[in-house]
Amino acid sequence: IDGVLVGGKAADGNLFKKNATYGVKDDSAYIAIANTSGLPQTLIKNPLYTSTYGMGEQIKQALNLGKKNIYLFLGGSSTNDCGAGMLAALGCKFFDENGEQFIPVGGTLGKIASIDDAEMRKSIEGVRFTALCDVKNPLLGKNGCSYVFAPQKGAKGDDLSTLEENMRLFYEKTKYLRVDQNFDGAGAAGGTG
C-alpha cells in the first residue's frame, strides 16, 4: 500500500484506552480490528463483555483526517457485538427499555429497545466502507459467529445460546435498514461483517 501509520488513543476490547495505529494513504484509511479489539490486546477474554468501540474510534479519527475510503480488516477480534460498539463510537445511540443510553456488548445486544442513528449517518455521509475478511460464516445459526467463533474468544456453555439470541434480537431491531445482514461473511469479527 505504501502508506503511513498514524494513531492515537482507542479502546481495546475491554474499553481500556491504549495506543493503536492504522494506515493511511491519500483519501483512504486501513483499519484492522485486531489492533484494538484483537484477542491478544484484550485482557478479559469473554465475548459477552467485549466491544468493537475502539475500531469505531479509529474510524472517527480517520474521518477527522478527511478520509473518504475506509477499509476494515475483520479478523482476530475478541468481540461478538455485531459491531454495535463501533457504531456507538461513530455516534449511533442505543437505548434500553428505560430510555437509558448504553454501549451494547455481546451480552447486552438483546437489551436494545430503540436506536437513534441520525448523528452516525451524518458523520459517515459520503464515505465508502469496504470490509475485508477471510471467513464466510453468516451472522446467525449453527455456522454463525456465536457458535463457531465465540468459543475461541472465551465463551463457554450457555454463553453461546445467549450470544446467539442477543445477536438475533439485534438483527430484528436493525431490520429497518432494509439490508440482508445474514449473508456469507456477516459473521466476521463477531458480526461486524
Task: State the predicted function of each range.
Residues I1-L74, S78-G193:
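N-terminal loops that bind phosphate or other acidic moieties
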